[in-house]
Amino acid sequence: MSLPVEDVRDYPRPPALEPAGARVVVRLGGAVAAESDRALRVLETHHAPTYYLPPEDVAAELIPCPGLTFCEWKGRAEYFDVRAGAGRARRAAWRYPRPSPRFRALANHLSFYAGEMDACEVGGVRVLPQPGDFYGGWLTPNLVGTVKGGPGTEGW
């Protein structure tokens, strides 16, 4: 599948929530940890899209981790270690159990840090993790524009 060109500068703020429109696959430890044709994605100015899969499409074992974070748009997130096949990734997935009303459709959907998985794909296209160690977006080759997260971009 060929993904359409998207300019991250055109993504909205506050962020938007929409169907991913493509099959999303997460691999870990030689196994498919999650796979969905019903994934959602969050789009925000200068960010790579963040993909969220329905819990029933996640085959991996999720082990709760201590600590929470708060997003001004989506609410409080909780984190999980992920175990699939022969692999285990620490604090590699998160969800919003009770998101803000605008993002209600995300409730309990799981997102994965691409850099902690063996591979993540959107529409058969392998992704790269969003730069930095904070954001969980997935970079695909169809994205143009500067993506926040790398050195010197944290403050804008």
Language-model features: locations:
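Terminal leader/tail segments of proteins
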Residues: 1-156
